[in-house]
């Protein structure tokens, strides 16, 4: 994150609007305060100062999403479609957005079990349990990185070996490894995350994607850029 924030600092004098996509940009608050004539669009996180304290800046438009809602429907879909009656969620790091996805998914499975008698088990491997920003163990299956395909594949294969036939993957680049594990298994479906991952699911003449949970971030960024162009913020 420090390198990311420095990258913003290096270019801030050259632009009127800077779009910062991702949680790693949350610490731009101090830069924004020091550059009140530059508008910042912060995607998928809220701004903090250099010490991680939440702040509000008139020149930062921060957009966040209710991941738990999309995760809920992913959980319902997984429970309703699972044939093995075992499903799981694989996430990257236990940041709030990922924990929201996890809890939403689990709630969706539990709801389907209660309302539709699906009888589906949520599989968690204790050695991959996540620890959130408050140092609380949140369970789940966390790769520990958003850019570790090798470990993603290991986690995915471990869950498949436990009998899971549907995996909800919210793990960034690490999720590519989970996709590979699912493709190699041949009888596993995956729920994609943030964008439509249908093309990523291609596996010969088949496709492993059951559905995808969308944030449609590009539309929200475009909307705010248009607002700035029209003189608003």
What does each of the following model-derived ranges do?
Residues 1-233:
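A residue-level marker of the well-folded mature domains of exported/periplasmic proteins
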């Amino acid at each position: 994150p420090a390198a990311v924030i420095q990258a913003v600092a290096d270019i801030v004098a050259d632009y009127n609007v800077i779009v910062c996509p991702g949680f790693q940009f949350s610490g731009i608050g101090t830069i924004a305060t020091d550059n009140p004539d530059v508008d910042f669009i912060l995607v998928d996180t809220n701004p903090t100062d250099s010490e991680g304290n939440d702040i509000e800046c008139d020149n930062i438009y921060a957009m966040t999403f209710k991941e738990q809602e999309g995760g809920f429907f992913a959980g319902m879909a997984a429970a309703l479609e699972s044939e093995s009656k075992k499903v799981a969620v694989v996430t990257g790091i236990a940041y709030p957005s990922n924990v929201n996805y996890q809890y939403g998914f689990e709630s969706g499975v539990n709801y389907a079990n209660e309302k539709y008698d699906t009888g589906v088990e949520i599989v968690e491997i204790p050695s991959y349990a996540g620890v959130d920003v408050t140092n609380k163990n949140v369970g789940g299956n966390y790769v520990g990185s958003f850019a570790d395909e090798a470990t993603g594949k290991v986690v995915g294969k471990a869950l498949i070996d436990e009998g899971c036939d549907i995996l909800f993957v919210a793990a960034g680049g690490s999720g590519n490894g989970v996709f590979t594990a699912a493709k190699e298994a041949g009888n596993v479906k995956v729920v994609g995350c943030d964008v439509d991952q249908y093309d990523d699911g291609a596996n010969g003449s088949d496709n492993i994607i059951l559905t995808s949970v969308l944030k449609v971030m590009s539309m929200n960024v475009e909307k705010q850029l248009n607002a700035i162009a029209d003189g608003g913020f």
